[in-house]
Amino acid sequence: MPRIQPKQLSEIPELAPIFQAGEQLMGFVANDGLTMAYRPDILKAFLALVQSIYADGKVENELKRLIGLICSAAAGCEYCQAHAANSAEKYGANFEKIQAVWEFRTSDLFTARE
């Protein structure tokens, strides 16, 4: 049970484009975004940050998601770990690779670049 109840999409129609962009990026509407909707300025800044991180670039999306999984685990956020693992799978990481993410230096599942 969250300490702050996330807003319902029906309560914030003016933020619909933000949640559509987030859903397109992640495949779902995240509760943390619905909670940030109490502060639209923070929500908009956070979305810009996330879009910048996940924009096409030199690092593949699968690897970005695996890095996110390690960061989430290091921060102790099980909510974030679940979403990062799901996203890593969505972008090409198989179950074994996700399970072995902490052995990236020694596991044959990872390339030298990873």
Regions found by a protein language model. Name each.
Residues 103-114:
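Short Fe-S-cluster ligation motifs
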Residues 67-85:
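Short, thiol/selenol-centered motifs that function as redox-active sites or metal-ligating centers
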Residues 43, 81-100:
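Iron-sulfur (Fe-S) cluster-binding segments and ferredoxin-like electron-carrier domains
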Residues 1-59, 112:
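Mobile cap/lid helix-loop segments that border enzyme active or cofactor-binding sites
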Residues 60-67:
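Alpha-helical scaffolds flanking conserved acidic
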Residues 33-34, 50-51, 68, 85-86, ...:
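Amphipathic alpha-helical segments within well-ordered protein domains
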